[in-house]
Amino acid sequence: MIELDINASDKSLSHRAVIFSLLAQKPCVVRNFLMGEDCLSSLEIAQNLGAKVENTAKNSFKITPPTAIKEPSKILNCNNSGTSMRLYSGLLSAQKGLFVLSGDNSLNSRPMKRIIEPLKAFEARILGREDNHFAPLVIVGSPLKACNYESPIASAQVKSAFILSALQAQGSSTYKENELSRNHTEIMLKSLGADIQDQNGVLMVSPLEKPLEAFDFTIANDPSSAFFFALACAITPKSRLLLKNVLLNPTRIGAFEALKKMGASIEYAIQSKNLEMIGDIYIEHAPLKAINIEQNIASLIDEIPALSIAMLFAKGKSMVRNAKDLRAKESDRIKAVVSNFKALGIECEEFEDGFYVEGLEDISPLKQRFSQKKPPLIKSFNDHRIAMSFAVLTLALPLEIDNLECANISFPQFKRLLNLFKKGSLNGN
């Protein structure tokens, strides 16, 4: 059995630790920070807003917040990070100054009205391009009034932007979503002194009476990154894998539960229960069966491209529905998955809110065909999750990915670890 510490810190927690430090009064320490491009964007923006960032050890930082958020003299560049743009929008909505947030072409084409509308419910002064649909975003910080908001989508980024505004508003605000999204923001902020209460699925957020408490966070491994190697184990005969030190928040392990329903042997071993549950995940290869994914989409939406690869190895037709938000990610992930599968000759079809895949069960005929004829180049669409999902498929098929380097956005060690897995020499180092 292979034991693997993927050394890929959780992206969600890394972003939040940096952003929340700006609401503290004293220096904060973040250990095992994810040095991916997205999280580094959040760190750079914190510096541009006046925070002092010191590198104290490998992947660890001491962040000293400014006495007051500084109005930057330049655009705040979020690059490809939607989390940075959406959470900073909530934070800056009540801060004195003019703030412009922009990103690369991909980010500036992703939907931003989903955060502008709830922030405007506070009477925040925020504008976006094309009638508030897209970035760049312009924010003129101003006093906020408390509000009650019911979100039409389950999105941790929307919820987090709302909470960050609500903490700075005049009076208590409430937020409701139709399905529980990731709850790291609520957990972290409550541990730092924020008054956030869950009343039968409705969040009540009271304004901060004092700055957040200083913190010293050590960030666990990202379950979304770990899932790529759970997938690798699930599609590789006779494989057994132990993933170490993984964040096991129940809102983040939906993909592991789906893979378990498909037939893979998966067990969890909780190691600690401090701020968040952290532990090990044991995976063993087994024949896979088809699955229909239609509920609790928020708990696995980032992993659906990887799950589509598992569906390819399953017996029967697998279906994904109610996942329209996949079209609003770094790429249109429904189109990306289906177009690549069709190029490989896989029976599949896309819907407005999902797709279906006819599992091959036996992939050897496809492998034999590609050994005689060069397979088509897999298009990553410059989307890290599409690139990594199809890279795992190269364990079974001789494929090439057009831009695997985009994995550096969230998982800089991915390519090296996958190559070691292919060679059978993966030792967790």
Curated annotation (Swiss-Prot):
It comes from the Bacteria. Its EC number is 2.5.1.19. It is found in: Cytoplasm. One of its GO terms (biological process) is amino acid biosynthetic process. Pfam families: EPSP_synthase (PF00275). InterPro entries: Enolpyruvate_Tfrase_dom (IPR001986), Enolpyruvate_Tfrase_sf (IPR036968), EPSP_synthase (IPR006264), EPSP_synthase_CS (IPR023193), RNA3'P_cycl/enolpyr_Trfase_a/b (IPR013792). The active site is at 302 (proton acceptor). Phosphoenolpyruvate binds at residues 11, 82, 110, 157, 333, 385. It catalyses: 3-phosphoshikimate + phosphoenolpyruvate = 5-O-(1-carboxyvinyl)-3-phosphoshikimate + phosphate. 3-phosphoshikimate binds at residues 11-12, 16, 155, 157, 302, 329. NCBIfam families: aroA (TIGR01356). HAMAP family: EPSP_synth (MF_00210). Catalyzes the transfer of the enolpyruvyl moiety of phosphoenolpyruvate (PEP) to the 5-hydroxyl of shikimate-3-phosphate (S3P) to produce enolpyruvyl shikimate-3-phosphate and inorganic phosphate. This is 3-phosphoshikimate 1-carboxyvinyltransferase. It comes from Helicobacter pylori (strain P12). The gene is aroA.
